[in-house]
Amino acid sequence: MTGWSGLFIEVPLYRLASKVCCHLRGPQGFLQRACQGVCCLPRDSRAAGIMEEKRKSFISQILILGEVLCMVDVSMSIKCGILFLLFGGAISNLGSPEHVTKWFWPLKEQKYTGMFAMTERGHGSNVRGIQTEATFDLDNQEFVIDMPCENAHKMYIGNAMHGNYAAVFAQLIIEGKSQGPHCFIVPIRDENGNLYPGVTAIDMMHKEGMNGVDNGILIFDKVRIPRENLLDKFGSVTPDGQYHSPIQSKNARFNAILATLTPSRLAVTFQALGAMKLGLMIAIRYSHSRRQFGPKDKEEVKIIEHQMQALRLMSHLATALAVTFTSRHADDILDEDIFQGRALTNSRSLQALMAGLKAYSTWETVSCLQDCRECTGGMGYMMETRISDLKCDTDVFVTFEGDNVVMLQVVARELLAQYSKQHKKNLLLGVIQNWTATAGDKLRTSFLAFNTDTVGCLAFLLKAVNFRERVLQRSLVSRIYYKVVTKKGDFFSAWNSCMHHVTSLSLAHIHRVALEQFTTAVRQCPNREDQALLMKFCLLYGTKLVFQERGWYLEHKYLTPKASMLIRAQLLNLCESVKDDALKVISAFNIPHITIRAPKTGIPNPGAAEAAYPAPMQPLVRDAARAQLAKL
């Protein structure tokens, strides 16, 4: 399809990605080849003529390449992310220029590999509470990395069994006082792969999926590192043992440290998208080739003709498009901020968007792949189809890089902060605006309301998702205010008692942003034929959002029972109308055929020997018995 530039993997980048993927199919050096592809991307990109400003678009290229690599092998994509986005990102975002020269450039040249050690046995999402300690030894000008208890053991650490260095988060302690979590570069293995004294690495062995990543446990027993190994962008220790930071508040400093690491959440969104698109391509291709049932005395019909098959797959395809457009939007903002040298700590709305997208996209990926598996029947259960493999590999996406419920709390806190800031500028004006907005929403749902928008049109759907977000935001503000200010309760208990409301508001916000970005993509599409098809999927996505929350809309009288039935009918009709054009859409994903390895989709791949059923070396016992029965 034409006119989809910037929304999917563009053709020049597809060629580069396909070249990298073909390169990766070699029998040896799988991860090494992948790392080469990531490291040499700026040079290859220039040769391919992709971008004029390679530096400005470098983050975009890395994220999209991560999406493509996830289609090849999820484990490989994740391990590349560990090396360059997590470990490398910690050095470049938390370290000084000297740290970048000393650690990052050798990493890029593949002189060593690293790992990212933040999660502990006792603390995962609550990074502030980690128990690993880095105590400054003034006499020796060293930090002593130690773990006072078993709960401080670093767990689920990717590349733990092979990495040479680790970016270790620990409480920085000077003269018995903690300055909060900081990041340190700790040597793990020498050039021969031998662990340094005081370091223990334990293989966590088999997991549900992603077994190509060597997750392990790291234990430090009084490991000494030079003072210079502290990544000191937000906090440094002088030779005389004095702590200095450009940010005086410990809480603000901690938030700044974490903010610089949030781009990895957007990377997870891109990786989830890669798995989602591949699963949909396989399931949709299969549904257009497989036939089951049909009218009496007539040919069986393709299973995509069955209503539930189309409903399940087309709804997910619309969601994949919406997440694609929204993630590209977030990527553009991130790329521009980094290119202009803006601090991510000041981009709270972007942090919230990346956190919300990570939660929404990974939950949708898990749901999508489950439906893809069911829609492909027994073949979906076979490893050769790759869907079951993708399911197992991506299940962890909902908890790593931040548990999804925690991610949604990041979104809600930012929305509350925006609400508070808006009303603090001018208290009287804020009260008036709040009153008029509330009155307007009540009028909109009263018997006096006169709705000029046809139920189900794009304008109606956009207003519906905006209405839901506004109402949930005001409702959460009033609940928190009542519990904390009126009832004098503590904030933690008040927040916890509103958690269902918090997650509902955050998802409503992401739904609204996604539908608006989808609408923008439709309007910017230069090709009329493509624009018409995109509009159908945009309507389908918006209709799906309203339909899945129809109970809430009925409760708030935004929908009447009749309107709810119209929404359901529109959802079914749209799925029916786009099911044949879905082949064009998945073709526009530009997924390299070398990555698909699913013969039942009708895509030949002679390089995928593992997807074939080999002939037995000798006749099976049951075959001999069957031959005897044939003679009787």
Curated annotation (Swiss-Prot):
<protein>
    <recommendedName>
        <fullName>Acyl-coenzyme A oxidase-like protein</fullName>
        <ecNumber>1.3.3.-</ecNumber>
    </recommendedName>
</protein>
<dbReference type="InterPro" id="IPR002655">
    <property type="entry name" value="Acyl-CoA_oxidase_C"/>
</dbReference>
<dbReference type="InterPro" id="IPR012258">
    <property type="entry name" value="Acyl-CoA_oxidase"/>
</dbReference>
<keyword id="KW-0274">FAD</keyword>
<dbReference type="InterPro" id="IPR009100">
    <property type="entry name" value="AcylCoA_DH/oxidase_NM_dom_sf"/>
</dbReference>
<dbReference type="GO" id="GO:0006635">
    <property type="term" value="P:fatty acid beta-oxidation"/>
</dbReference>
<dbReference type="InterPro" id="IPR006091">
    <property type="entry name" value="Acyl-CoA_Oxase/DH_mid-dom"/>
</dbReference>
<keyword id="KW-0560">Oxidoreductase</keyword>
<comment type="similarity">
    <text>Belongs to the acyl-CoA oxidase family.</text>
</comment>
<dbReference type="GO" id="GO:0003997">
    <property type="term" value="F:acyl-CoA oxidase activity"/>
</dbReference>
<dbReference type="GO" id="GO:0005777">
    <property type="term" value="C:peroxisome"/>
</dbReference>
<dbReference type="InterPro" id="IPR055060">
    <property type="entry name" value="ACOX_C_alpha1"/>
</dbReference>
<dbReference type="Pfam" id="PF22924">
    <property type="entry name" value="ACOX_C_alpha1"/>
</dbReference>
<feature type="binding site">
    <location>
        <begin position="376"/>
        <end position="381"/>
    </location>
    <ligand>
        <name>FAD</name>
    </ligand>
</feature>
<dbReference type="InterPro" id="IPR046373">
    <property type="entry name" value="Acyl-CoA_Oxase/DH_mid-dom_sf"/>
</dbReference>
<dbReference type="Pfam" id="PF01756">
    <property type="entry name" value="ACOX"/>
</dbReference>
<keyword id="KW-0285">Flavoprotein</keyword>
<dbReference type="Pfam" id="PF02770">
    <property type="entry name" value="Acyl-CoA_dh_M"/>
</dbReference>
<dbReference type="GO" id="GO:0071949">
    <property type="term" value="F:FAD binding"/>
</dbReference>
<dbReference type="InterPro" id="IPR036250">
    <property type="entry name" value="AcylCo_DH-like_C"/>
</dbReference>
